[in-house]
Amino acid sequence: MELPRQKRIYSSLETRFTDFDSLTQELKERELTGLVRLTFDACEGIIIFDKGRITDGYEIYGDEMPVKDRRGRNTRERSRIEPGKIDVYELPREILQIFIMTLRERPTQTLHTMYTDFRKLLNFYVDRKLYGTLEVKTSQGKGYVLLDAGKPVDVFFCNKCGSEALNELLNVVDQEDVEMDIYSREGGVR
């Protein structure tokens, strides 16, 4: 799964050489707001931190919906017995909250670029100051546009983020038919 990657703190730490409890303690002392991604052969685990506290966790198996992993308990246990990689990202709180909402929800609508213009859809969200996430499924993977009051607060696609990811996503959407899942909600993330 593609994740927001504002500021990478650690990359590709191996679980067999990393004491996850010590890493968690360090992130607590740093008062991390962001996420820890653990990648294993069978699944990915995402552990959410808010001001140094573990607040949530999810396990993702392939392209399936994320499965709730209360405070990352299963993921932390798996890190002790299975080889895997650990990545740690610091994120602005608003981006983290929008991303968490997307993990928790099912899409409210699915559209296809065969019938819908992606740029017009983005402009519609901006004009109406809507909140939500656009998940774009391409041949190169999934891309995400996180919107707060219509403003794209983050875009991530193909290991890129921000305007670079948006430009790459727009190029791909121009060249192929893609499916878009829309996660929209009333109000904001405050």
Predicted feature descriptions by range:
Residues 1-190:
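Acidic, Ser/Thr/Pro-enriched low-complexity segments and adjacent helix/loop capping patches
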